[in-house]
């Protein structure tokens, strides 16, 4: 809505006025102080007139760029996209070099195109953050659709176990939904903890740490080995 556009406009003006802060930003949770001189006065007509500034812009990529700079934005995007990349690998969708390289290309090109197109059209950064989020989301959807259309049906040897695939797919959907949400919303502490906790669960399932099928034989083997000496004693002849 108009409130978000005005906030993004103020952040765009702040970034344009201080190019020396682009590498590292104004500092985590310091957006309120840096944004105050660039507050758009028209925002008071549609928002609380007592509000003099905002500490969040309702767009996580733009927040990251303003508070942690280009380096922080790249690090955050890399962390999120690595989760998407490995989820695709664990689902068996990127099991060879060609598919992995194509997925990397999509995930790199998506945010770049998403940032450059609004910058070229609007001549400012106010929609660049939204474009980055849309670019990542569309890149992931396009790659998954492309693989679904061109990939042959998996053989029994290549098929991922159904229970593991279901859990990873569900967790990937939750993580992607949260990523979409923070393009126009504010990531509060609860949602951030949820995101990284579920990311940890997905990694554990993906690498097999939570695979009950692999742990069961090890548990059942111990009683069998312990029972062997007892069976020998029962079969021994008395002296």
Can you name each region flagged by the protein language model?
Residues 61-68, 100-133, 169-196:
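Membrane helix-loop boundary segments at the extracytoplasmic
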Residues 70-107, 137-166:
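Hydrophobic transmembrane alpha-helices and their immediate junctions
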Residues 82-134, 151, 206-221:
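Internal, charge-rich low-complexity segments
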Residues 1-66:
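Interfacial juxtamembrane loops and adjacent helix segments
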Residues 48-93, 165, 169, 181, ...:
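Polyanion-binding and phosphate-handling cores
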Residues 233-239:
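Internal/C-terminal transmembrane anchor helices
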Residues 218-230:
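Intrinsically disordered or compositionally simple regulatory linkers and C-terminal tails
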Residues 133-146, 195-217:
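Hydrophobic cores of alpha-helical transmembrane segments in multi-pass inner/ER membrane proteins
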């Amino acid at each position: 809505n108009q409130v978000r556009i005005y906030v993004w406009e103020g952040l765009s003006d702040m970034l344009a006025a201080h190019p020396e802060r682009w590498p590292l930003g104004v500092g985590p949770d310091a957006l309120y102080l840096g944004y105050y001189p660039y507050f758009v006065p028209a925002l008071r007509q549609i928002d609380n007139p007592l509000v003099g500034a905002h500490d969040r812009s309702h767009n996580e990529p733009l927040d990251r760029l303003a508070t942690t700079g280009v380096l922080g934005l790249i690090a955050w995007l890399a962390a999120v996209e690595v989760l998407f990349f490995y989820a695709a690998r664990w689902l068996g969708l990127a099991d060879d070099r060609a598919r992995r390289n194509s997925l990397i290309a999509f995930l790199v090109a998506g945010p770049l195109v998403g940032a450059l197109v609004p910058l070229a059209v609007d001549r400012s950064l106010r929609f660049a953050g939204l474009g980055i989020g849309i670019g990542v989301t569309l890149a992931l959807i396009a790659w998954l659709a492309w693989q679904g259309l061109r990939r042959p049906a998996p053989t029994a040897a290549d098929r991922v176990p159904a229970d593991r695939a279901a859990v990873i797919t569900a967790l990937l959907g939750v993580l992607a939904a949260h990523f979409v949400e923070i393009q126009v919303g504010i990531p509060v502490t609860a949602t951030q903890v949820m995101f990284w906790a579920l990311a940890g669960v997905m990694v554990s399932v993906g690498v097999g740490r939570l695979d009950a099928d692999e742990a069961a034989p090890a548990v059942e083997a111990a009683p069998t080995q312990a029972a062997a000496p007892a069976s020998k004693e029962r079969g021994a002849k008395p002296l």
